[in-house]
């Protein structure tokens, strides 16, 4: 049997009793998962990003069970994913490392040139950032796997997005879901946008990652695995940044 204990990054106190019980800390009650009957030298399990895990082993055979091993600490890093080139609109150019989206200046297209990222598991907190290069109109957000590829991001009940569109005097950030919208106007155009998909807290947040400021927060009980989604409406490029630890401004949001 191999118990697996999870610990939050901000977990501050712990105590083990009889090898199977862990007390509640000031912040979070840790939980255990056990895997019995492991017959191969390896076992694959899904772990949440930005979490500390304690692994314990105990051997079992017809003659009895061994003592539980000492804890092995494994700390996971931030969510990492790539763009799915097969989902890209023909007008978009996707880099060989599947992290850069480009819409050429003279590209001719109909509809909304979009592309999806790899599917994120429906648990934990996922954070990524987008660096904007000379693109004045774009959409970034998430959509459930069941979302129709022909639909427009943010105009149905299975997608949520931030739509950046310039005006004569400012930049308008429009937050869309099922076609309903909320507008935020800013005088500067952030070149780095952060997105936090928080399944645990039921939130989707968009940040000005340069200044560490929340642009918009959506409260919703997200239930399904989701694709990060991107659409360019004007020429330019978006670069995807993943695998990072949660910035302090995200932890405190």
Tell me what each language-model feature is.
Residues 1-253:
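Beta-rich ligand-recognition domains in immune and ubiquitin systems
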């Amino acid at each position: 049997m191999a118990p697996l204990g999870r610990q939050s990054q901000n977990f501050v106190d712990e105590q083990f009793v009889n090898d199977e019980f862990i007390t509640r800390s000031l912040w979070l009650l840790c939980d255990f998962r056990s895997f019995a009957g492991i017959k191969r030298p390896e076992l694959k399990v899904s772990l949440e990003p930005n979490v500390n895990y304690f692994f314990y082993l105990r051997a079992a055979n017809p003659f009895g069970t061994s003592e539980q091993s000492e804890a092995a600490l494994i700390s996971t890093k931030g969510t990492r994913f790539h763009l799915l080139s097969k989902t890209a609109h023909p007008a978009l150019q996707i880099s060989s490392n599947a992290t850069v989206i480009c819409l050429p200046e003279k590209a001719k297209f109909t509809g909304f040139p979009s592309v999806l990222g790899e599917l994120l598991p429906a648990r934990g907190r996922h954070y990524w950032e987008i660096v904007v290069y000379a693109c004045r109109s774009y959409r970034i957000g998430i959509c459930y796997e069941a979302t129709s590829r022909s639909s427009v991001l943010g105009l149905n009940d299975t997608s949520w997005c931030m739509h950046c569109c310039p005006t004569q005097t400012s930049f308008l950030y429009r937050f869309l879901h099922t076609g309903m919208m909320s507008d935020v106007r800013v005088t500067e155009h952030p070149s780095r946008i952060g997105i936090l998909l928080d399944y645990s807290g039921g939130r989707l947040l968009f940040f000005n990652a340069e200044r560490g400021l929340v642009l918009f927060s959506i409260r919703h009980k997200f239930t399904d695995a989701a694709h990060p989604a991107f659409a360019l409406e004007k020429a330019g490029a978006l670069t995807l940044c993943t695998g990072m630890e949660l910035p302090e401004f995200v932890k405190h949001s």
